[in-house]
Amino acid sequence: MFRYFCSNRFSLSITISTRDLVKRYHSRTVVNHVSIEVNQGEIVGLLGPNGAGKTTTFYQVVGLIKPDEGDVFLNEENITALPMYKRARMGIGYLPQEASVFRKLSVENNIAAVLEMSDLTKAEQKEKLETLLDEFRLHHVRKSNGDLLSGGERRRTEIARALAVDPKFILLDEPFAGIDPIAVEDIQAIVAKLKYKNIGILITDHNVTETLSICDRAYLLIEGKIFKQGTAEELAEDEQVRKLYLGRNFELKRKDWLHEEARSEVGIPLENMIASVENALAWNEKIIEANTQGERAFGHQYISADTKIADLGLDDYSKFLLELKQSLITYGKQNKNAEILNRADKFLTDNGDINTDLNTILLFLKSEQR
């Protein structure tokens, strides 16, 4: 019987991590042995009161500040000494709090300027420009200069421009600062969508309500050390966290950004849906390989195929498949594709082979491209 292998050690995703970061200013230690990690396809918050060390930690991940001790890694590659532009070439995008659009360039030229540095042909650059303008609802301001944009339009332009080079991670510094409440929801929906592009997001922001509401996980820094880490719910329910940071009356306002509402607003591009299914197939191949090498080689327990995927908790593989199923259902509804919807609805619910199901779904998705 084919068996599935689930382990946090076993993943195709890329990870940014820090190990024991330390930063001192004169005799004061502002970051004290801080270790965090961000995986592709998740949203992580870096939170804390003023003076807690969160901004200094964030800037060490970005490459703006060099740590006195500790290291920053992209997977197992040490990137601590690399300048920002080299980190960007490795797929680490950064959006500062301050406006970063070229003020005297139009929206389309802001994006085109970045596309010109890519390996795409002129035709491909033009196609990608139109895709980004459409995806971020910027067509109506495409000819407007950067200094004429609203706060929300500016943020959407900055994120669209960052995506022009297909980053693996985006580091967001105060993304909700200086924009109105409607624009905040707009940016939240966009950040949620980035997760479904398999982009890892690290956010630091003083607006804790807006930030926690979209985070999968968060780190809370107090006096330069990690005081608490966990899901947004775990932080919100912790009495000490409430006492020291959130306040007694704090209420976590979760919105299902990742399902019907946000995805019906921003849509799921066909190419992203295809990429997700292909990623699942590649992951499955690795699982089969792990299974043939035997339990001894990995030191982990195997899970039989007749175990329900829903019973596998938060293991990376099962979580990815469950989210993929929901994405497929949403895509089928959006595009009124009964066949995709039917296949997605049955996915993970019967005794069918996952590899066969994924290949069948992939064929239907690719037929949409023709």
Question: What are the roles of these predicted feature ranges?
Answer:
Residues 123-141, 189-192, 240:
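Conserved ABC ATPase "signature" region
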Residues 170-174:
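Catalytic Walker B motif of ABC-type/P-loop ATPase nucleotide-binding domains
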Residues 62:
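Helix-to-loop junction immediately C-terminal to a conserved catalytic motif
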